[in-house]
Amino acid sequence: MSVSDSLFERAKQLMPGGVNSPVRAFRSVGGAPFFVKAARGATLVTADDQELIDFVCTWGPAIHGHNHPRIKAAIAEALEHGTSFGTPNPYEVEMAELIVRFFPSIQKVRMCNSGTEATMSAIRLARGFTKRSKIIKFAGCYHGHSDSLLIKAGSGALTHGHPDSAGVPISFAQETVVVTYNDRAALEAAFAANVGQIACVIIEPYCGNVGFIMPDAGYLQAVRELCTREGAVLIFDEVMTGFRQARGGVQELENITPDLTCLGKIIGGGLPVGAFGGRTYLMDLLAPLGPVYQAGTLSGNPLAMAAGIAALKLLDEENPYARLDQLGRQLRDAVLAAAKTKGLPVQVPQRGSMFSIFFTPQPVRDYASALAGDAKLFGRFFHTCLANGVYLAPSAYEAAFLSTAHEGAAIDRACEVLASAINEL
């Protein structure tokens, strides 16, 4: 029995499914998960000493690769002063300054501990501001595991065939209106059916939790216009895309100004973190200034702030986005070329350092077209790649990520492995 298998057997006796987040259990692709004991650059080292080129990047945060010396040093320096204070600290002020600098839509920001906390709190703030209760989300988009948002959710909920989670009261579900991504008419119809009742629209501007899906030209602008017309707060969930697609997120690339923005992942440098921010008139409704309550024991944790500050400063200094897009295109082109030779229908939506591989003949532009892909074939593809040293997300419905550490031999080897895996299908 391998070390990973032994650990998994022990874990299953102690944790539900043997994991602390469902997608890690490999239920979508089959087999047992491996355990990781170390990571550096673009490489994971398993408990059995197998080295894997990693395209999960801890589900997005590791844009600089694993164990970056600048981030390690920042954490070590902060650790010299303590792990947590329960008071304001200088690091959270510097982090807020960086976020406000790079996101013009954000005038004030509140730190929290996860993307789920960020989206949950942003929705509460939108409800407090509008004095309305209903929200609109998009089928397949995942915004964390709070009750209001586990309605036709993506990510692990979609992977495991339970887009509507047990334990969510019907009364909660009735407050969430679900529409199709990339369908303006559906959004207009949702507003028309709920006149004066919609507090907010929450959207992944580039979807990453039903696989990677891009918006149609003009779609995000249409969403912005409809929210303005209907008096609803527009929330961009950029937990995944913020600082990954651009320093100012998708809103910078698409020239859209949301009312509230949710952040996470990269801003923690690999440590637990979340944040949400927006215009002063909205943010000042939060306690202690206003009536909308939000709090957290470890919010603004100095270690997470120090790691995140180092990560953001590296992005500012290196501006790696064009380079990351080139790496993404190289990988995409290798897969498409192999699929063409094989005669296999494959879609590889890619922008910057995010991509997905769907085994389907039709372009993927929403939840339904993502589900039309061949998930079983993806599972075979995944395991062939894994056996040859390349780790993709263990689900057909998750985005993959690149880092600056994937340059050179890592990307060349990955292209070879992915092309070969296509040929073996």
Curated annotation (Swiss-Prot):
Hey, which pathway is this one from?
Porphyrin-containing compound metabolism; protoporphyrin-IX biosynthesis; 5-aminolevulinate from L-glutamyl-tRNA(Glu): step 2/2
Sorted alphabetically, the keyword list is: Cytoplasm, Isomerase, Porphyrin biosynthesis, Pyridoxal phosphate
Any one GO BP annotation for this protein: protoporphyrinogen IX biosynthetic process
Question: What is the superkingdom listed in this entry's lineage?
Answer: Bacteria
The family database entries (InterPro entries) matched by this protein are listed as:
4pyrrol_synth_GluAld_NH2Trfase, Aminotrans_3, Aminotrans_3_PPA_site, PyrdxlP-dep_Trfase, PyrdxlP-dep_Trfase_major, PyrdxlP-dep_Trfase_small
What pairs make up the disulfide bonds?
Answer: none
Q: Which residues carry this modification: N6-(pyridoxal phosphate)lysine?
A: K265
- Entry GO terms, CC: cytoplasm
Q: Which PANTHER family match?
A: GLUTAMATE-1-SEMIALDEHYDE 2,1-AMINOMUTASE (PTHR43713), GLUTAMATE-1-SEMIALDEHYDE 2,1-AMINOMUTASE 1, CHLOROPLASTIC-RELATED (PTHR43713:SF3)
Query: What assembly does the database describe for this protein?
Result: Homodimer.
The name this protein carries in UniProt is Glutamate-1-semialdehyde 2,1-aminomutase
